[in-house]
Amino acid sequence: MTLEQYIESVNAKYKLGNATEHTFRGLLEQLIESIVPEIRATNEPKRIKCGAPDYILTKKEIEIGYVEAKDIGDKDLAGIKKTGNKEQFDRYKSALPNIIFTDYLDFHLYIEGVFITKVAIAEIQNGTIVSLPNNFA
């Protein structure tokens, strides 16, 4: 699956109007494993001490990272709002060496609790998810 195929698939489900955060989980798993074939993305792995991140990323059976996904359009991917994702994100950032927070369109990478970078591969425009190829091409 390419990034464009992923975005098209996410958009098709999003436009139905009844999708939730969980609707897109399989698509993200497919994307990760397609663009980085040596990585396995396990959706809904076993709970760990700090909580239950949505995905665990493994390479040769070694845990190398985690992904926490929120619903498309989540306004707190930085985890700064006390009424948003702050408590959960702070807990994950302090316990997990590599974690990505995403709303399936925007991805924020933290290493050892420090924000490293973010990339938006698409955005919502007039109820449609539109690719931002200049950000990833």
What is the predicted role of each segment?
Residues 131-137:
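Non-catalytic C-terminal interaction segments of nucleic acid-processing enzymes
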